[in-house]
Amino acid sequence: PFVITSPCIGEKAADCVETCPVDAIHEGPDQYYIDPDLCIDCAACEPVCPVNAIYQEEFVPEDEKEFIEKNRNFFRNR
C-alpha cells in the first residue's frame, strides 16, 4: 500500500482524496492517511500530491519510515 508522510502535516491539500478510486484516504487531525486494507496500489494519489508526501510503502525514505506505523495505527485505533 501507499503511505502519506510528513510533508502532508499541516498541508492537507486533499488532491489525493479526490483522486483515490476506492476512497482509501481519510482525514486525520494533522494529515491524511491511506487505509492499507482498502488501498489497491493503483498509485493515482502519488502524482497529484502537491507536497510529494505519498510513497509506496517499500519506497518510504528512511527518515519517514515511522509514518508506515503511524498510518497503520490510525486505522487500527478507529
Swiss-Prot record:
<feature type="domain" description="4Fe-4S ferredoxin-type 2">
    <location>
        <begin position="30"/>
        <end position="59"/>
    </location>
</feature>
<dbReference type="Pfam" id="PF00037">
    <property type="entry name" value="Fer4"/>
</dbReference>
<feature type="binding site">
    <location>
        <position position="20"/>
    </location>
    <ligand>
        <name>[4Fe-4S] cluster</name>
    </ligand>
</feature>
<dbReference type="InterPro" id="IPR050294">
    <property type="entry name" value="RnfB_subfamily"/>
</dbReference>
<keyword id="KW-0411">Iron-sulfur</keyword>
<comment type="function">
    <text>Ferredoxins are iron-sulfur proteins that transfer electrons in a wide variety of metabolic reactions.</text>
</comment>
<feature type="binding site">
    <location>
        <position position="39"/>
    </location>
    <ligand>
        <name>[4Fe-4S] cluster</name>
    </ligand>
</feature>
<feature type="binding site">
    <location>
        <position position="42"/>
    </location>
    <ligand>
        <name>[4Fe-4S] cluster</name>
    </ligand>
</feature>
<dbReference type="InterPro" id="IPR017896">
    <property type="entry name" value="4Fe4S_Fe-S-bd"/>
</dbReference>
<dbReference type="InterPro" id="IPR000813">
    <property type="entry name" value="7Fe_ferredoxin"/>
</dbReference>
<keyword id="KW-0408">Iron</keyword>
<dbReference type="GO" id="GO:0009055">
    <property type="term" value="F:electron transfer activity"/>
</dbReference>
<dbReference type="GO" id="GO:0051538">
    <property type="term" value="F:3 iron, 4 sulfur cluster binding"/>
</dbReference>
<dbReference type="GO" id="GO:0046872">
    <property type="term" value="F:metal ion binding"/>
</dbReference>
<keyword id="KW-0677">Repeat</keyword>
<feature type="binding site">
    <location>
        <position position="16"/>
    </location>
    <ligand>
        <name>[3Fe-4S] cluster</name>
    </ligand>
</feature>
<protein>
    <recommendedName>
        <fullName>Ferredoxin</fullName>
    </recommendedName>
</protein>
<keyword id="KW-0479">Metal-binding</keyword>
<keyword id="KW-0249">Electron transport</keyword>
<feature type="binding site">
    <location>
        <position position="49"/>
    </location>
    <ligand>
        <name>[3Fe-4S] cluster</name>
    </ligand>
</feature>
<feature type="binding site">
    <location>
        <position position="45"/>
    </location>
    <ligand>
        <name>[4Fe-4S] cluster</name>
    </ligand>
</feature>
<dbReference type="Pfam" id="PF12800">
    <property type="entry name" value="Fer4_4"/>
</dbReference>
<keyword id="KW-0813">Transport</keyword>
<dbReference type="InterPro" id="IPR017900">
    <property type="entry name" value="4Fe4S_Fe_S_CS"/>
</dbReference>
<feature type="domain" description="4Fe-4S ferredoxin-type 1">
    <location>
        <begin position="2"/>
        <end position="29"/>
    </location>
</feature>
<feature type="binding site">
    <location>
        <position position="8"/>
    </location>
    <ligand>
        <name>[3Fe-4S] cluster</name>
    </ligand>
</feature>
<dbReference type="GO" id="GO:0051539">
    <property type="term" value="F:4 iron, 4 sulfur cluster binding"/>
</dbReference>
<keyword id="KW-0003">3Fe-4S</keyword>
<keyword id="KW-0004">4Fe-4S</keyword>
